[in-house]
């Protein structure tokens, strides 16, 4: 019985390690800070990935610039090729002897100068195209947006149009032009323009009447002017009217 009791006690107080503890390798369970080191490594990896993505984005942004420069270079190269071809053609024309057989020395010189001028103009045109220079000037170069811009634009347009005011077709041209440019306006805007033209018409009528009145005052008096006035004065002497008047007329 005693032996059985000892065996019982031994079985009862045997310490059994938990299954989870036995599965954990030795030395790992005691390191409480190991997980934090792993998290730091993960964070470092994320930072590296973000930096790599930023570098890739920067490279992608730079690619269009490179391709754009390449396109510009190709365009310039193509223009130079065309210009070179034109210059060769001009050179052939300058050196062609058969073209000058029937020309006088003066005509040959004039032809050479003309071809030289064409070559210079061609070179200038190439330079303008290369650097993106716009040939537009004056009205064509304007793009009005503010009130001052439209005022300046109107001045230039007026100078351009009024140089043809002596033409017989000028009035009909303006009539059609005003109608066409006003066709898209609102009623209120059309009324303003109509009122402005009405006022202008009234002013022109007043000026015309004043001008006609001045011409009448400066005109010749009916009946002979000064001569008729002197004749009337002599007629006031009664009986001497016929004789003196006749002598006066003969004298005049």
UniProtKB/Swiss-Prot annotation:
It is found in: Cytoplasm. This is Eukaryotic translation initiation factor 3 subunit J. GO terms for molecular function: translation initiation factor activity. It comes from Gallus gallus. Residues 65-130 form a coiled coil. The gene is EIF3J. Residues 36-56 have a biased composition (Acidic residues). One of its GO terms (biological process) is formation of cytoplasmic translation initiation complex. Transmembrane segments: none annotated.
